[in-house]
């Protein structure tokens, strides 16, 4: 390499992987294994009560073309846990290729996981491919949320170039019970004001609860709706509850999501959500 080598050829792409395994031992849910490398980190803060929290962090500060990021959590039989991210994830303009994120969680028999990542903010020219999958053993359940914000309204940002593919799925006994693919590109952004697309919304979220008695949460969930500037729809059947939300800005969406999660969980959100 010499002084004439193009800067773009010298840029290093981030690559991170974090794996956390929780299991019941001596009457409590404890950390059994922790493996992490590169830009992906995981830590377990001190919390009140007997439900541990796992916080994942991308130390690279954001995602751009060619980056790789993987988060995995294994929740043992009869264990309950909450997992989240340290902050909002940001996907910046991609120089070449797409950033790829893989989130794979497994919940053992009669276990429960609240997967509560903070929102993903997409910037102009971002290229991101993400797969989120939660696999539930018999008797297990989960609560999952995914929020996406198209630029920062407060900064006057409007997106016209984007390549975003996002697939979220929940498997119960190896069979998919919730599958939600989302694809947004330049053409979709151009049509985003139409009723068939986002209706002018710049922020969207999906909440899904799967497990025994999930349908019973429909009433409390609907009662928790009503944040100004947020449109929402909720349905429940066959052991699952699904809510979809649209908003013109990320802040009212975040407030509505936080209220819903607090109601559905019956306790406060992880502290990192409150910072």
From Swiss-Prot:
Q: Which UniProt keywords apply?
A: Chaperone, Cytoplasm, Nickel insertion
Superkingdom assignment: Bacteria
What cellular-component terms does GO give this entry? cytoplasm
Q: Which GO terms describe its molecular function?
A: nickel cation binding
Subcellular locations according to the entry: Cytoplasm
Matching InterPro entries, A to Z? UreD
Disulfide links within the chain: none
Classification via Pfam families: UreD
Q: Which PANTHER family match?
A: UREASE ACCESSORY PROTEIN D
Q: What does this protein do?
A: Required for maturation of urease via the functional incorporation of the urease nickel metallocenter.
Protein family membership: Belongs to the UreD family.
- Subunit structure, briefly? UreD, UreF and UreG form a complex that acts as a GTP-hydrolysis-dependent molecular chaperone, activating the urease apoprotein by helping to assemble the nickel containing metallocenter of UreC. The UreE protein probably delivers the nickel.
Q: What is this protein called?
A: Urease accessory protein UreD
Q: What is the scientific name of the source organism?
A: Cereibacter sphaeroides (strain ATCC 17023 / DSM 158 / JCM 6121 / CCUG 31486 / LMG 2827 / NBRC 12203 / NCIMB 8253 / ATH 2.4.1.)
* Gene transcribed to yield this protein: ureD
């Amino acid at each position: 390499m010499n002084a004439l080598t193009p800067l773009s050829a010298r840029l290093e792409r981030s690559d991170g992987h974090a794996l956390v395994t929780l299991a019941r031992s001596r009457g409590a849910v404890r950390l059994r294994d922790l493996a992490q490398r590169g830009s992906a980190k995981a830590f377990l803060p001190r919390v009140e009560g007997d439900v541990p929290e796992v916080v994942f962090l991308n130390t690279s500060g954001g995602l751009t073309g060619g980056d790789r990021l993987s988060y995995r959590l294994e929740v043992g039989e009869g264990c309950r846990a909450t997992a989240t991210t340290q902050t909002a994830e940001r996907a910046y303009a991609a120089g070449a290729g797409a950033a790829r994120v893989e989130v794979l969680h497994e919940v053992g028999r009669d276990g429960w996981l609240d997967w509560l990542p903070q929102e993903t903010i997409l910037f102009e020219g971002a290229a991101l491919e993400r797969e989120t999958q939660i696999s539930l053993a018999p008797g297990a359940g989960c609560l999952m949320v995914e929020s996406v914000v198209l630029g920062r309204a407060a900064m006057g940002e409007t997106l016209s170039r984007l390549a975003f593919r996002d697939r979220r799925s929940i498997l119960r006994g190896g069979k998919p019970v919730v599958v939600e693919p989302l694809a947004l590109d330049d053409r979709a952004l151009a049509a985003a004001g139409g009723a068939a697309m986002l209706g002018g919304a710049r922020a969207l979220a999906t909440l899904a609860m799967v497990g025994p008695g999930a349908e019973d949460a429909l009433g409390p969930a609907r009662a928790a709706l009503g944040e100004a500037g947020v449109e929402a729809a909720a349905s429940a059947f066959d052991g699952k509850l699904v809510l979809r939300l649209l908003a013109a800005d990320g802040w009212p969406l975040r407030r509505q999501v936080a209220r819903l999660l607090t109601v559905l969980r019956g306790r406060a959100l992880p502290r990192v959500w409150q910072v």
